[in-house]
């Protein structure tokens, strides 16, 4: 694409292109050092499991026809592997030359692909899309196998009967898989991105964690989707733009208005994972209006950077002053298992230091940490804003209630016709935390009926009561419902595998 909004890897030179092809930004890897057992995990758990779920949805078949899932899996395996092997045999019999070519493609897209991808036993999501060519190749052999069986029968009646059965199989597969793949009413991912963007003040910067809380935002900004609704933009509070920051934002908006067709183009989405790369930092600096003092020479030598012992942050032009400082140890307190700071950690510090007070700055609540700024953030629902006022578990309750009650859309979440996989379920649970915070707030205010209404809304998004522990500890204590408190501790906390962590944190 010409001037893509997000130029992944920015492969504009041969060395950068090779780095992109070799996935250097994800770290060095070796084919010889296996990240998991080749046969047990990479072939068995990953490839064969992915392969199996492409044909007949056993969960749907079990729920609809009451056929045991294990039995259906066995039947499907016999049909799919049997037809494919018959197809391979017939292919070889009819045309050895094309069979050998096809077999080489099958080997490359299965065994060799598994070896090259070297998937770990702790992948963050299913990677079945890596092997889509293998599924298609095997489907061709299945088709040839079906043709072979019809061809081998001598009677016309037998041919017609078998052909009918073989036509029913793909139809049955389509029916069983339809709900899983139907996206006609699925707005969860779109609403996720739109809700994040609409909860931010004008010209905000938001740090996001990974794919799930980044791509939906990019999509909502880049694509003119008629189902994406922009709410009235919240004007910036505690923001004091300078001539430099205003000029940078104006330049960025000229670029973004030209290439983006969606909503909230004023927002800068800064992905923490990509902030480890020089090409992405350049894009934020040059096209997103982010003040960033590292020049190109420094960006080319990122691994020579050293974190300061103290970080001073202040808002230029604020009266009264808005400023705070953080002491930085050699080992990050927010990631004690690692010895040093990541490039992205230093990039976040630099962005906050240079842009604080000039633009609103937020972290998505999905971030694994706030890079040491936890004490200086104030929750507003799905986002936490950086503030100069220190505190523990700070909440802007007015903005939180505004977001969860008036801004966020929750389409598809309670629609049983919309299939939700584990990934979708995890996304949805993030909404629950806002309602829990509202429930705790009203409990502390003595408005117990409101508290119960909000916690009931939280239950729509949170799958187990154990995740409501903080609320029930506060609520039962405030209302002096000691018997219910004891029952919750005995039945919910003490029966949980993490009771040894939860009990000291909330009960003692």
Predicted regions and their residues:
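ER/secretory pathway lumenal C-terminal domains and tails of membrane proteins involved
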Residues: 1-132, 136-203, 214-508
């Amino acid at each position: 694409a010409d001037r893509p909004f997000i130029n992944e890897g920015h492969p504009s030179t041969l060395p950068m292109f090779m780095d992109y092809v070799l996935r250097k930004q994800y770290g060095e890897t070796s084919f010889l050092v296996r990240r998991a057992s080749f046969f047990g995990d990479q072939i068995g758990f990953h490839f064969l499991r992915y392969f199996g779920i492409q044909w007949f949805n056993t969960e749907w078949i079990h729920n609809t026809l009451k056929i045991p899932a294990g039995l259906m899996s066995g039947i499907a395996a016999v049909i799919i592997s049997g037809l494919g092997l018959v197809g391979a045999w017939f292919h070889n019999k009819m045309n050895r030359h094309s069979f050998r070519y096809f077999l080489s493609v099958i080997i490359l897209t299965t065994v060799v692909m598994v070896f090259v991808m070297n998937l770990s036993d702790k992948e963050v999501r299913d990677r079945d899309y890596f092997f889509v060519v293998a599924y298609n190749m095997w489907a061709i052999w299945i088709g040839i196998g079906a043709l072979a069986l019809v061809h081998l029968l001598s009677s016309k009646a037998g041919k017609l009967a078998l052909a009918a059965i073989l036509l029913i199989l793909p139809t049955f597969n389509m029916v069983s898989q339809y709900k899983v793949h139907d996206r006609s009413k699925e707005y969860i991912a779109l609403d996720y991105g739109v809700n994040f963007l609409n909860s931010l003040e004008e010209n905000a910067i938001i740090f996001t964690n990974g794919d799930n809380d980044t791509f939906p935002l990019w999509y909502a900004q880049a694509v003119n989707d008629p189902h994406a609704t922009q709410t009235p933009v919240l004007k910036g509070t505690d923001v004091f733009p300078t001539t430099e920051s205003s000029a940078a934002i104006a330049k960025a908006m000229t670029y973004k208005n030209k290439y983006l067709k969606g909503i909230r183009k004023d927002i800068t989405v800064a992905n923490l994972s990509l902030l480890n790369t020089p090409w992405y930092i350049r894009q934020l600096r040059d096209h997103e209006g982010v003040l960033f003092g590292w020049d190109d020479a420094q960006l080319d030598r990122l691994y020579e950077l050293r974190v300061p012992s103290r970080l001073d942050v202040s808002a230029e032009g604020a009266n009264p002053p808005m400023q705070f400082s953080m002491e930085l140890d050699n080992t990050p307190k927010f990631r004690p298992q690692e010895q040093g700071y990541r490039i992205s950690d230093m990039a976040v510090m630099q962005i906050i230091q240079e842009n604080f007070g000039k633009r609103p700055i937020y972290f998505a609540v999905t971030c694994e940490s706030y890079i040491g700024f936890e004490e200086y953030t104030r929750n507003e629902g799905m986002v936490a804003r950086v503030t100069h006022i220190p505190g523990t578990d700070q909440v802007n309750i007015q903005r939180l209630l505004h977001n969860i009650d008036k801004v966020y859309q929750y389409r598809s979440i309670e629609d049983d016709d919309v299939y939700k996989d584990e990934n979708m379920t995890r996304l949805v649970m993030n909404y629950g935390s806002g309602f829990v915070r509202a429930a705790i707030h009203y409990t502390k205010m003595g408005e117990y009926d409101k508290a119960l209404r909000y916690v009931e809304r939280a239950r729509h998004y949170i799958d187990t009561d154990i995740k409501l522990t903080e609320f029930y500890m506060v609520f039962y204590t405030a209302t002096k419902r000691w018997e219910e408190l004891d029952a919750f501790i005995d039945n919910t906390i003490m029966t949980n595998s993490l009771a040894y962590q939860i009990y000291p944190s909330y009960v003692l």
